[in-house]
Design a protein with these regions (language model features):
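Cysteine-nucleophile active-site neighborhood
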Residues: 30-103
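Short secondary-structure boundary/hinge segments and terminal tails
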Residues: 19-21, 68, 106
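Amide-donor transfer/coupling interface in amidating biosynthetic enzymes
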Residues: 88-191
Length: 191
């Protein structure tokens, strides 16, 4: 999806690679495993530093869980990179996966098809965090603050590049103006 819109994407596997990028996507998967790997390979403090100094960050599904301030579950301990509280697997198990049409603030045109697979939900948003999409019953499924974006669905599964284009804009802003990112929750070291 990223190459489709002209992004020269790399897989970040070493902490030193963070210095080469203006934006990072933490994808779906298993949030506990993602946090364990980020911790084991000493990404956590470096990632916080990069986000605090303006790097764009996007957490999708499990990535949203990873970057949240707080979870309804005791594990994993999230990284506190955006001031939201999240409930894991809100819509149920794998068999309960579904698709929905969403109107996303900042995305023009028709509603965007969103794929929810064991998806989390945003329960609360902190000061300055903007809810940019919700389900028909009002559940927040996409939020943004500064250059940090979090979505509970998998936009990479639909072929629609509009949300990726929005993220590209955030990464370009980071490249052009790497000032402090206004996205982070309180004190990240408190997690």
């Amino acid at each position: 999806m990223l190459r489709k819109i002209g992004i020269d994407a790399i897989e970040v596997r070493k902490v030193q690679q963070l210095s080469e990028i203006d934006g990072l996507i933490i994808p779906g998967g298993e949030s506990t495993t993602i946090v364990k790997l980020l911790t084991r390979f000493e990404f956590v403090d470096h990632l916080r530093e990069k986000v605090n100094s303006g790097m764009a960050l996007w957490g999708t599904c499990a990535g949203m869980i990873v970057i949240a301030r707080e979870l309804a579950d005791p594990y994993p301990i999230p990284l506190n990179l955006i001031d939201i509280s999240v409930a894991r697997n809100y819509f149920g198990r794998q068999v309960d996966s579904f698709e929905a049409e969403l109107h996303i603030e900042g995305i023009n045109g028709d509603p965007m098809r969103a794929v929810f697979i064991r998806a989390p939900i945003v329960q609360t948003v902190g000061e300055g965090v903007k809810q940019i999409a919700s389900t028909d019953d009002g559940q927040a499924v996409a939020v943004k603050k500064g250059r940090v974006l979090a979505t509970s669905f998998h936009p990479e599964l639909t072929g629609d590049t509009r949300l990726h284009t929005l993220f590209l804009k955030l990464a370009k802003e980071a490249q052009e103006d790497p000032r402090q990112n206004s996205s982070t929750a309180g004190n990240p070291s408190s997690t």
